[in-house]
Amino acid sequence: MEAVIFDMDGVLMDTEPLYFEAYRRVAESYGKPYTEDLHRRIMGVPEREGLPILMEALEIKDSLENFKKRVHEEKKRVFSELLKENPGVREALEFVKSKRIKLALATSTPQREALERLRRLDLEKYFDVMVFGDQVKNGKPDPEIYLLVLERLNVVPEKVVVFEDSKSGVEAAKSAGIERIYGVVHSLNDGKALLEAGAVALVKPEEILNVLKEVL
């Protein structure tokens, strides 16, 4: 293997519960309920596509601009209070670097938000290549973000390992020709859906290091 590619939210960081809480608070402010099923519909999807989905599903009668502003304010509040890295992730990143294997990030999160979180947790330093959601025209499940990462890494899909926690992310990697995709499971995603999308196996964040020791 020549490279390892990580998604960010839900894989490197325990962020999905934070997204859920932020969206729940915003939905509640409109008098609407927010469910885990609805949250799964937008997991791994770029915000520019996810917010209109939420507005329609919640039947929110407001401008997208106002809704987006409220979401950003709530996300900033929640993330500043509760952001933390997933257990075992730093050790996994250190292991990859010790093997002199390239590390890349492929996240649907916009660059400014993503870098703020990576720097807060001191994780940015590990990555050779980073591609963000606002740097591609088509978000996951379109393969564009993974094709761009592969191009910047200058590696072929057969020489890459991917860790993703969303159905759309697994589908994106699969469509880019990558086969060795591990589905990272947590409290807010659906492991069965990850396998159906093409993940070769399911792992918890703290198990990523052991997987890497086997495949690298």
Swiss-Prot record:
Domain of life: Bacteria
Cofactor(s) needed by this chain: Co(2+); Mg(2+); Mn(2+); Ni(2+)
Cofactor note: Divalent metal cation. Highest activity with Co(2+), followed by Mg(2+), Mn(2+) or Ni(2+).
Active-site positions on this chain: 7 (nucleophile)
InterPro entries reported for this sequence: HAD-like_sf (IPR036412), HAD-SF_hydro_IA (IPR006439), HAD_2 (IPR041492), HAD_sf (IPR023214), PGP-like_dom2 (IPR023198)
Assigned EC number: 3.1.3.-
EC category name: hydrolase
GO MF annotations, alphabetized: hydrolase activity; metal ion binding
SUPFAM superfamilies given in the database record: HAD-like
Keywords: Carbohydrate metabolism, Cobalt, Hydrolase, Magnesium, Manganese, Metal-binding, Nickel
Function comment: Displays high phosphatase activity toward erythrose 4-phosphate, fructose 6-phosphate, 2-deoxyglucose 6-phosphate, and mannose 6-phosphate. May have a role in the intracellular metabolism of many phosphorylated carbohydrates.
Family classification: Belongs to the HAD-like hydrolase superfamily.
The protein, known as: Phosphorylated carbohydrates phosphatase TM_1254
Organism: Thermotoga maritima (strain ATCC 43589 / DSM 3109 / JCM 10099 / NBRC 100826 / MSB8)
